[in-house]
Amino acid sequence: MSHDSDDKTFPYEKDDAELRRRLTPMQYEVTQHAATERAFTGEYTDTEDDGIYKCVVCSTPLFESGSKFHSGCGWPSYFKPLNGEVIDEKVDYSHGMVRVEVRCNHCGAHLGHVFEDGPRDQTGLRYCINSAALNFESRPENE
């Protein structure tokens, strides 16, 4: 599933050759072709450090560690994005399912999907995100 056929345009212009040089093959396939890394293999699945998760393509801050929770699904899960402006949602009909795809609203990178089975005491949502779509920036301990 490539984003090339999508009508939406994003502010950050991506150069494919530059992305192929800069990203790992998994990061490229996940963000540019909506691939999914295998469950429980991602770098940030169990990360509990305090900080911000950013888009691996354009460095837009997407999620903060305070919204991360252990869902048991095998991918990093968050109950909300950093704010309502950073995420683009699109209905995804791939693989014989109807899901809601989550993309970076700045560059269009595929991040994962959002489901309505998150913590009920929060938003009730579970943003199920590929580690390969993220970079983590820890906060200094004195902040």
UniProtKB/Swiss-Prot annotation:
Residue ranges occupied by any MsrB domain in the UniProt entry: 16-139
Highest taxon listed in the record's lineage: Bacteria
Residues at the active site: C128
SUPFAM superfamilies recorded: Mss4-like
Cofactor: Zn(2+)
InterPro entries found in the cross-reference section: Met_Sox_Rdtase_MsrB (IPR028427), Met_Sox_Rdtase_MsrB_dom (IPR002579), Mss4-like_sf (IPR011057)
Biological process terms in GO annotation: protein repair; response to oxidative stress
HAMAP family in alphabetical order: MsrB (MF_01400)
Record's protein name: Peptide methionine sulfoxide reductase MsrB
